[in-house]
Swiss-Prot record:
This is Succinate dehydrogenase flavoprotein subunit. The keyword Cell membrane applies. Its cofactor is FAD. FAD binds at residues 18-23, 41-56, 225, 391, 407-408. It comes from Rickettsia conorii (strain ATCC VR-613 / Malish 7). InterPro entries: FAD-dep_OxRdtase_2_FAD-bd (IPR003953), FAD/NAD-bd_sf (IPR036188), FRD_SDH_FAD_BS (IPR003952), Fum_R/Succ_DH_flav-like_C_sf (IPR037099), Fum_Rdtase/Succ_DH_flav-like_C (IPR015939), SdhA/FrdA/AprA (IPR030664), Succ_DH/fumarate_Rdtase_cat_sf (IPR027477), Succ_DH_flav_su_fwd (IPR011281). One of its GO terms (molecular function) is electron transfer activity. Belongs to the FAD-dependent oxidoreductase 2 family. FRD/SDH subfamily.
Length: 596
């Protein structure tokens, strides 16, 4: 089958798949260390989803009041509901201040205080004095367009350091041999050619799989391509049951209203005009962690206190804030609310509803970004030649629930750490090991089979079934009955993939084929998500079980590892959470009941 296609071969020291914040930070970091670096991306780098991040990036700089990275670590462990690995969390929080100063040095135009320091705003779950003090102003912001500012800056650095970009190339599958990754195969959408990239190290920085759901703040490109490739390579994914619902997606549109809006003083109200978060989180109120706020909103709506004709959403008030603050600190939000909700935020509230926002789960890695698997008693056996970073990965610093503004931090800290590790492991221009023809043949055969699929189901039709099922059966609140039904439905939908129909057989800009390949990635991740959720009989972080309302540390303080066998069945395994720190500079945070 390989002879039927024009396959172009490349050799690089490292290949990064994805050009968002994590991918770019990793790519130019590796190029800076002298490694011949390629970056494959299915869309132009500055259109990557990092560009949509609004509120900010967390670091204990102490510009707006006393702060300490140890307090940041405590908040992150608590936010994770004690499913986060404390060695990785320590690494991230300790390196956060330097990461911000590095970004500033690269040219990120952060907002400023009157003294000229980087402006920091409060964000949900961020506190001082190990949760005993007031809210911490820890989130560094570039107005409400922080991701945009960071992504453009990182792209400039990548060009400066001569990263070689392959733009609008769709990554199909990993080249795996003897349990090692030797490269990746991609399809050039512009001319239809297939490309075999050989590399000593492949970095998956492909983002999350938010588009497995019907309503998500994610771009339509967020199809979890790295996770799909990992599953097909026989690797497990970790903690896939933990899907974050952001409290404030615009009602009916799903577009994000940043948590920074509440950080600047915005608040939620129900149909009675009551600031209901005071009942659910008396101390943190509207700035409790995202899972807590999303559940509170869902309960208010369920109990008949929603607003609007159908009483199916709540209001976010910003109209008490001065127009000057809205213009200087939340300019993008004012514009988004006007376009997608028809609301003038200076005069009226924004209709909002919890919306799928982030995947805490992903490809398991250590804090160097190296992909790890369970091998006998060794839970951290490294997969040679493969790394994963950003939302595609599960380090796990976010555990069962991510704190707002920790995701941009995750991207730059672990993007940098992956580059440092690669430079340590790889000698520039060292020879590549040979690959077997059948390894490439297998990848091309799968691609060709999808391209010539001539069944009865349209890709868009099958995708919509999956999205609606995930939205209704793996949502904010879950029960065994609903999850089991959802697992059966997603299994059936996934089996329908072999009956899809591709109308366009061409190789140049074939969006029908792109969407089919993306759907394959989404279906595998949807499947392991719902099966992992059905198996976890407790409530922890974003995984809220109505039939098991309490956290159960004795039985369930462990990471889920999920894979799919050749028969299409989900196989679940578990490994312990790391409850020890990396150094003696900080003590581990013991599990307690999580209250805000």
């Amino acid at each position: 089958m390989t002879k039927a296609y024009n396959i172009i071969h490349h050799k690089f020291d490292v290949v990064v798949v994805g050009a968002g914040g994590a991918g770019l930070r990793s790519a130019f970091g590796m190029a800076k260390e002298g490694l011949n670096t390629a970056c494959i991306t299915k869309l132009f780098p500055t259109r990557s989803h990092t560009v949509a991040a609004q509120g900010g990036i967390s670091a204990a700089l102490g510009n707006m009041g006393e702060d300490d990275w140890r307090w940041h670590m405590y908040d992150t462990v608590k936010g994770s509901d004690w499913l986060g690995d404390q060695d990785a969390i320590e690494y991230m929080c300790k390196n956060a201040p330097d990461a911000i100063l590095e970004l500033e040095h690269y040219g990120v135009p952060f907002s400023r205080t009157e003294e000229g320091k980087i402006y920091q705003r409060p964000f949900g779950g961020m506190t001082t004095e190990y949760g005993k003090g007031k809210a911490a102003q820890r989130t560094c912001a570039a107005a409400d367009r922080t991701g945009h500012a960071i992504l453009h800056t990182l792209y400039q650095q990548s060009l400066k350091h001569k990263v070689q970009f392959f733009v609008e190339y769709f990554a199909i599958d990993l080249l795996m041999e003897d349990g090692e990754c030797r490269g990746v195969v991609a399809w050039n959408l512009d001319d239809g050619s297939l490309h075999c990239f050989r590399a000593h190290n492949v970095v998956l920085a492909t983002g999350g799989y938010g588009r497995a759901y019907f309503s998500a703040t994610s771009a339509h490109t967020c199809t979890g391509d790295g996770g799909g490739m990992a599953i097909r390579a026989g690797l497990p994914l970790q903690d896939m049951e933990f899907v974050q619902f952001h409290p404030t997606g615009i009602y009916s549109a799903g577009c994000l209203i940043t948590e920074g809006a509440r950080g600047e003083g915005g608040y939620l109200v129900n149909a009675n005009g009551e600031r209901f978060m005071e009942r659910y989180a008396p101390a943190a109120k509207d700035l409790a962690s995202r899972d807590v706020v999303s559940r509170a909103m869902t309960i208010e709506i369920r109990e008949g206190r929603g607003v609007g004709e159908h009483k199916d959403h709540v209001f976010l008030h910003l109209n008490h804030l001065s127009p000057e603050i809205l213009h200087s600190r939340l300019p993008g939000i004012s514009e988004t609310a006007k376009i997608f909700a028809g609301v003038d935020v200076t005069k009226e509230p924004i209709p909002v509803l919890p919306t799928v926002h982030y995947n805490m789960g992903g490809i398991p890695t250590n804090y160097h970004g190296q992909v790890i698997i369970k091998d006998g008693k060794n839970h951290n056996s490294v997969v040679k030649g493969l790394m994963a970073i950003g939302e595609a990965a599960c380090v796990s610093v976010h555990g069962a629930n991510r704190l707002g503004s920790n995701s941009l931090l995750d991207l730059v800290v672990f993007g940098r750490s992956s580059a440092l590790k690669a430079a340590e492991l790889i000698k520039p221009a060292s020879p590549h090991r040979s690959i077997k023809e059948e390894s490439l043949e297998k990848i091309i055969n799968r691609f060709d089979k999808v391209r010539h699929a001539n069944g009865n189901i349209l890709v868009a039709e099958l995708r919509l079934k999956m999205q609606r099922t995930m939205q209704s059966h793996a949502s904010v609140f879950r029960t065994q009955e609903v999850l089991d039904e959802g697992a059966g439905m997603i299994s059936e939908i996934r089996s329908g993939y072999k009956d899809i129909k591709i109308n366009d057989k061409s190789l140049i800009w074939n969006s029908d084929l792109v969407e089919a390949l993306e759907l394959d990635n989404l279906l595998d991740q949807a499947l392991v998500t719902v099966y992992s959720a059905a198996a976890r009989k407790e409530s922890r972080g974003a995984h809220a079980r109505e039939d098991y309302p309490d956290r159960n540390d004795e039985d369930w303080m462990k990471h889920t590892l999920s894979s799919i066998d050749e028969a299409g069945k989900v196989v679940l395994d578990y490994k312990p959470v790391t409850l020890t720190t990396l150094t003696d500079e900080v003590t581990a945070v013991p599990p307690v009941k999580r209250v805000y």
